[in-house]
Amino acid sequence: MYHKMGRKIEEYIRPSTFPLAVKTIKLENEIPQNYRRPSKDLKLQNFVCQNFKMARSYGWTIAITEKDINCQVARAIYGWDPITDETTNWMNLFSVGLYAKDVETSEKLFKHLYRLDNLFQGLIISPLTRSKVVPDVVMIYCLPAQAMRLTQGYLYCEGGALEFTAAGRVGSCHEGIAKTLLTDKPQLVLLGNGDRIWGGAQDSEVMFACPGGKLGILVEGLEATHAAGLRYPIPAYMNYSPGFQESFEKEAKKRAGGTIVRSAAYFENG
């Protein structure tokens, strides 16, 4: 079922990389031995966003736990490291002068964080069209116009409006995974510096995250709105005759070798 819905998303949205199925795991022994692990197969620790990039670009199924990840911000979001006074102080030292003008400003972000408080031990990340897991979250890296179509599709069935938050940082892990899980609502994610520097996200990319249990709603709406005429690629209106600014038109006609003049005369003479 999820494979079919993944193919529908690829058909109607045409993302440049695979939509991702992300499954949370309670225990490490739930991970099959043949799934790739950064610590086992790559012989290193890395950032979570790097694994999103490898899965969506290479088509790999990747499993991670805290043993695989050395991103302190991600470890705090997933609850793999406790939030202590020392952790808070480190985050403030990191932010002040970079993301915030002072400690007081930096600390305001904590009021808006969604943390998973060690609710699970890891993630399995797999391309949706060939997913080996039932997703808790589906992540689609896309262009803004593609995100528009995903939003239209979801709201076709649900109505109302989607509400998003953004801090310009901690995008895929915080808003893409944690907030989507805790609110059970789709999120439009402005990917931050981590996603772009280490996670390989392009300048043009954003991300749309959908709870796995609501993927059917999204796909139903995509199909219906596509049939009604809302499409991607956007069918730009082309049924018009081009022209020039008045000050440029005379010179343009000369440079066109008479083509524009003859064309106009053709229609005038019937």
Could you say what each language-model-derived stretch is?
Residues 3-270:
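Acidic, serine/proline-rich low-complexity intrinsically disordered regions
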